[in-house]
Amino acid sequence: MNKTSLKLFAIEARNELMEKMRTRLDILGITKNGIEKAKVVGREVEINGSLYPRESYNSLVRKYKQIGYEELVEESAYTWFNRLTALAFMEANEYIDEKMIFNNGLKNEPGIIDNYYDFEFFKNLDSELQKELHDLRDENTANSIEKLYSILVEEKCEELSAIMPFMFKKKGTYSDILFPTGLLLENSLLVRIREEIGKEAPIELIGWLYQFYNSE
């Protein structure tokens, strides 16, 4: 375990995730200066032509009003750092079967994208969401695969919330619509997580990662 490399990664990940959160909030019409009014469309809200779950959006607005913009950026970045590194650690130690972070062979994409339909958490989803996931996979564009991946990660987090509620929250919270983009690109944060955590991650590695992340 190379602590120098871990520290550098954790600090870079923090900065990158915070920037991703700012970008995502901007898309959602949320800035330091306030919140643009969203259009309510049934159980969703429309912002700049895109639809988002109303429950998650309302949770985000409440959080913004409660802690402010900068703290929201910090907290949401830390939330996703914790979740992604925890998933990688659980995979590396075979606590979960799905490859939510690690890839198969030479492919850059996480293995779950190719065989999500084989796993129990997918089979437990309602038929409408299952169809949406299949349609996204069949569309096979960069945007559709990224959306497919974000939904799969969120649904796996939902499943894990039953046994690890301190790490993985149930759907409907503000973090759902702040899923970090660009994770499937080459040299993305996801690739660096794989490199740092590796295939046989000792438990103390996670502790060091969190310590280094919070050292800034």
Predicted segments, located by residue:
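Preference for the N-terminal adenyl/adenosyl cofactor-binding alpha/beta module
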Residues: 1-216
